[in-house]
Every structure is written in C-alpha cells, then in structure tokens.
Amino acid sequence: GTVFFDQDSPDSPVKVTGEVTGLQKHGFHIHEFGDNTNMSADGSSYLQVSGSKLTQEGQASMEVKGNAGARVAXGVVGIAK
C-alpha cells in the first residue's frame, strides 16, 4: 500500500492518508531508519488522519514512542517530487 504525509506549512496540521490492504488491526509504527527484511503477513486497511498535534517539524514532530507489538509488515517512507 501507500501512505502520504502532507503538510502545507510548518504551522499547519499534517494530513496522513493512505490505503494498505490485507492487514489485521495493528498499530501504525514509523521509523526514520529501519530494517525491513523481516516482513510477514498479508493485510488491508484504509486510513486518513489529521490534526493540529501532528507536525513534521520541531519539538512536536510525529516522533512518538511506544509498543506497537510484533511487526506484521514493513515499508519505506520516501519524499515524492
């Protein structure tokens, strides 16, 4: 699937949209760098998230720490031009 992170300006909320297919319900976990060689499971999900507490810059950036559970799939986050 594909997930998009859009932010019009540093002061505007981040809009997260995407569609991933074949997944059971799980947490959504993103790392700047990571090993995606440990992939398994096939699943599906649609998501759209936005809010003033989401930002891609500064102290309040989307860096959240927690336990999302076992990895069921992995992907690469890149910048589209």
Curated annotation (Swiss-Prot):
Matches recorded under InterPro entries: SOD-like_Cu/Zn_dom_sf, SOD_Cu/Zn_/chaperone, SOD_Cu/Zn_BS, SOD_Cu_Zn_dom
GO CC annotations, alphabetized: extracellular region
Organism superkingdom: Eukaryota
Gene Ontology MF terms: copper ion binding; hormone activity
Tissue-wise expression: Central nervous system. Coexpressed with CCAP in most CCAP-specific neurons. Coexpressed with pburs in the large bilateral lateral neurosecretory neurons of the first three unfused abdominal ganglia and in all anterior bilateral cell pairs in the thoracic ganglia.
Keyword Aminoacyl-tRNA synthetase in record: no
Disulfide bonds: none
PANTHER family (alphabetical): SUPEROXIDE DISMUTASE CU-ZN -RELATED
Subunit structure: Heterodimer of burs and pburs.
Job of this protein: Final heterodimeric neurohormone released at the end of the molting cycle, involved in the sclerotization (tanning) of the insect cuticle, melanization and wing spreading.
Identification of the protein by name: Bursicon
Organism the protein comes from: Periplaneta americana (American cockroach)
Gene expressing this chain: burs
